[in-house]
Amino acid sequence: MGDASLSVLASSQVVAEGGNNFLVPNGTFFFVLAIFLIVLAVIGTFVVPPVMKVLRERDAMVAKTAADNRKAAEQFEAAQADYEEAMTEARVQASSLRDNARAEGRKVVEDARAKAEQEVLSTLQLAARQLKRERDAVELDLRANVASMSATLASRILGVDVAPAAATTSATKTSGR
């Protein structure tokens, strides 16, 4: 308890001497305040303007980048639309070309088929005429030789020699029914 009474006694002496009042500021406070204001002025004058300049440049750069991105996106949209339009036009054109090629191919096939049918028809007509000529020639030959052939056949069957004139008369009698 002796220490507490000594400190109360020391404080009462300081108050009695009129020295250290905590409500009245001392010189240290003013000195620290002056240093703070000087440092604040130096920082505000030499440090803040370059930092603000860099920040403004970055803001401008970010704004320019955003504008460039928007412009690039718009250009991309326009290019995409042009591409889609060109592709649609190309598809329509390709479809038209394909349809034309199919129609032309069908026409070529039909023309070839018609030509082949015409050739077949002409070949058949030629063959028919040739067969008719050969048939007529064979018929004439057979008519010319029928008498001698029938006489020869009758001779072989009957075993008797038959004359061609008799064979002709007997052949006309049997066929004349």
UniProtKB/Swiss-Prot annotation:
Main location: membrane
UniProt topology in membrane: Single-pass membrane protein
TM regions (residue ranges): 29-49
UniProt subcellular location: Cell membrane
GO molecular function: proton-transporting ATP synthase activity, rotational mechanism; proton-transporting ATPase activity, rotational mechanism
GO cellular component, one term: plasma membrane
HAMAP family, A to Z: ATP_synth_b_bprime
Reported function: F(1)F(0) ATP synthase produces ATP from ADP in the presence of a proton or sodium gradient. F-type ATPases consist of two structural domains, F(1) containing the extramembraneous catalytic core and F(0) containing the membrane proton channel, linked together by a central stalk and a peripheral stalk. During catalysis, ATP synthesis in the catalytic domain of F(1) is coupled via a rotary mechanism of the central stalk subunits to proton translocation.
Family: Belongs to the ATPase B chain family.
Official protein name in the record: ATP synthase subunit b
Organism the protein comes from: Mycolicibacterium paratuberculosis (strain ATCC BAA-968 / K-10)
